Amino acid sequence: MFAVGLAALAISGTVVYADIIPMILAVGANADAPLTDGPASVTFRHLTTTPGDVGTWHYHPGYVHNVVTAGTVKIEDGCGETSTFTAGQAFETSEGRVHRAINEGSVDAVEYNVFIRDEGKPLTRQIPGNVRRCGPPSTVRECKHGGWSKFDFPNTFRNQGQCMAYVLLRPRVSLLVPEDPLQ
């Protein structure tokens, strides 16, 4: 029945987004996580993006560390930047930046993801209507030379100063840099 529904959508000319297959491997609670400066939910996920799939526009309200173990995945930022990662490479999708995953290859792209987020926050928030959004800005540099004008998520900015203030006033966590005491 599911295959018939997909065939009907394809025939009608409607774009069918993403046969992206997530599998939650483990979920745990960390009572005092440095990345969230308090209690955090930690989730391990296995994600398969099949050839030709284009994910929906979304963001993650927390930290996400990703490792590609097979195939190639392209991450398209809502502001137009793209990065491509192949098996053996790792990347982050953090700070609430809008993005989507694309598999332009001929084999499955397989990733393992670790989500670290404030307790009670979801893994992912979908952008309503699957509309491309740019933002939020992560650095003051992104606000300069007219860069402020491209951002429309979570809101627009009237000028460079307003964009820079948004970046500078975002909550931050300070972490000690881990050291190997024997080296």
Q: Which residue ranges define each predicted feature?
A:
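Glycine- and acidic-residue-biased ligand/ion/polar-headgroup-sensing regions
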Residues: 60-79, 89
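Soluble extracellular-acting proteins and domains
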Residues: 122, 132-183
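Ligand-binding loop in jelly-roll beta-barrel domains
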Residues: 95-122
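Sec/Tat-exported extracytoplasmic proteins
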Residues: 46-47, 51-53, 72, 77, ...
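Histidine-centered metal-chelating micro-motifs
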Residues: 54-56, 74, 91-102
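Bacterial N-terminal signal peptides
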Residues: 1-12
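A short glycine-rich, His/Asp/Glu-containing loop-to-beta-strand
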Residues: 19-56, 114
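Short acidic-glycine-tyrosine-enriched beta hairpin
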Residues: 49, 78-96
